[in-house]
Swiss-Prot record:
It is a multi-pass membrane protein. This is Innexin-19. Its main location: membrane. Residues 1-48, 140-214, 322-454 are cytoplasmic. It comes from the Eukaryota. GO terms for biological process: cell differentiation; determination of left/right asymmetry in nervous system; intercellular transport; monoatomic ion transmembrane transport. The gene is inx-19. It comes from Caenorhabditis elegans. Signal peptide: none annotated. Changing E70K: In ky634; absence of chemotaxis to the odorant 2-butanone, which is sensed by AWC(ON), but normal response to the odorant 2,3-pentanedione, which is sensed by AWC(OFF), suggesting the absence of functional AWC(ON) neurons. Specifically expressed in sensory neurons and interneurons in the head and tail. Expressed in neurons AWC, ASH, AFD, ASI, ADL, ASK, BAG, AWB, and ADF (head sensory neurons); ADA, AIZ, RIC, AIY, and AIM (head interneurons); PHA and PHB (tail sensory neurons); and PVC and PVQ (tail interneurons). Belongs to the pannexin family. InterPro entries: Innexin (IPR000990).
Length: 454
């Protein structure tokens, strides 16, 4: 017995729905949330694909499990013929002519008004989800090739911050500091650790030394911003529209003005379909009117996605500008590190007051006031752009307190490596303080005794 394409539909529809669900679930699970990103990155590579997957499942349920199209045929036609016409019109595309216009006799004019996107909406959404994840994949591959263990540092910092015992937490910070310093040494061509990977070799150039990770991170942010803009262009092409950039404004304006879809043509519900039937060696052409029920859902989905993409574009662009400024403007990096230095100094001063209540505690004068270039050297030559970037990432995920302890240890490491210059400026500081106090003998707390890292 001859079977129409629609008669084999249930099994095929179940397989297609299972394919879409499995593909979306596997894709999302492969991009798990990690610590080497921020909230804006997660909105792009994790939550947006999740939203697109949900939209894909909703549309697929209607498209493959429901009735996406219904066509009005001759009441005397057999049921098999009705199913055939609906299957044909679904596959072959339909076209929209406003009710107040006459249907053109020219078939070429009809083809120019064809609507051919509704069958491909689930695939379009999956492709968009993949595109949103590409910058994340690029970042993870390149950061791994750079040889820097960012994820390990952030995970260790989060675990260390969760420790309640002070001694255990201090040991954890010391271990993180050692790992951090090793990563910093890797930024120099003369580092103790041999670089592996093509990115690690490229970054040893004079220009990229200590900035490779920051450049990769900023470029990834740029990719996120460019991707959101590209989504509007892709939807313009898929929907055969030149104004999807303003689609949301148009829909809201139509709703406000009370204009129905029959006038605007946005995701039309009623369309026309031409098909040919060979009967007794003659080719007969017919036109039927069809109801695209799937377009009711498509309109709501794309209106929501337009609003989401617009919000995401603004947030992602602001995030890109923020990270560019913080990664490459020297004063921003110095101010950021100085903030933690001041917090650590204040903490040490309060501890000294607490344990020496009967003693006269002088203000802890730092060498930075007498040699500000040391702080610049600490940021530009020791931490470099990549070190400051890693501090920011650790702060975003583990909190500021562990970064305070980490900066204190890093400053101590910097002092040990530049002890001659520090001793010279310590002597200059003592002379200056005696001059300020009129030659009186001023006792300045020894950094080693007061545990001050400055």
């Amino acid at each position: 017995m001859w079977r129409t394409p629609a008669s084999t539909g249930p099994l095929r529809q179940d397989r297609q729905m299972f394919f879409h669900a499995t593909l979306a679930r596997s894709f999302i699970n492969a991009l798990s949330v990690r610590g080497d990103d921020d909230a804006v990155d997660r909105l792009n590579y994790y939550y947006t694909p999740l939203i697109l997957a949900v939209c894909c499942l909703v549309i697929s349920a209607k498209q493959y499990g429901g009735t996406p199209i219904e066509c009005w045929v001759n009441p005397h036609s057999r049921e098999s013929m009705e199913e055939y016409i609906e299957s044909y019109c679904w596959i072959q595309n339909t076209y929209w002519i406003p009710m107040y216009e006459n249907v053109p006799d020219d078939h070429t004019a009809r083809e120019e008004k064809q609507i051919g996107y509704y069958q491909w909406v689930p695939f379009i959404l999956i492709a968009e989800a993949l595109m949103f994840s590409l910058p994340c994949i690029f970042w993870r591959l390149c950061s791994f090739q750079s040889g820097l263990n960012i994820q390990t540092l952030i995970n260790a910092a989060c675990d260390g911050q969760a420790l309640l015992d002070a001694s255990d937490r201090q040991k954890a910070v010391e271990a993180i500091t050692t790992n951090f310093v090793d990563n910093l040494d890797l930024q120099s061509p003369n580092g103790r650790i041999r670089a592996r990977g093509w990115i690690a070799r490229i970054k040893f150039s004079r220009f990229l030394s200590g900035q490779c990770l920051s450049i990769l991170h900023s470029f990834t942010k740029l990719l996120y911003s460019m991707n959101v803009v590209a989504q509007f262009l892709i939807l313009n092409a898929c929907l055969k529209s030149s104004d999807f950039l303003f689609f949301g404004f148009q829909v809201l304006n139509d709703i406000w003005a009370g204009r129905p879809w029959t006038e605007t043509g946005h995701f039309p519900r009623v369309t026309l379909c031409d098909f040919e039937v060979r009967y007794l060696a003659n080719l007969n052409r017919y036109t039927v009117q069809c109801a695209l029920l799937i377009n009711i859902i498509n309109e709501k989905v794309f209106a929501f996605l337009w609003c989401w993409y617009m919000i995401l574009a603004i947030i992602t662009t602001c995030s890109f500008i923020y990270w560019i400024a913080n990664s490459f403007i020297h004063s921003e990096k110095v101010d950021y590190v100085m903030k933690f230095i001041q917090i650590a100094e204040s903490s040490e001063f309060k501890k000294l007051q607490k344990f020496e209540k009967d003693a006269t505690v002088e203000r802890l004068y730092t060498v930075i006031a007498f040699a500000p270039h040391l702080l610049d050297t600490f940021v530009s030559d020791f931490l470099k752009s990549d070190g400051v970037l890693m501090l920011r990432m650790i702060s975003n995920h583990a909190g500021d307190m562990i970064v305070v302890q980490l900066v204190r240890n890093l400053w101590q490491e910097f002092r040990e490596r530049n002890w001659r210059e520090f001793e010279e400026h310590e002597e200059m500081k003592d002379v200056e303080m005696r001059r300020i106090h009129g030659g009186e003998r001023i006792v300045i707390s020894n950094p080693g005794q007061t545990k001050s890292f400055l």
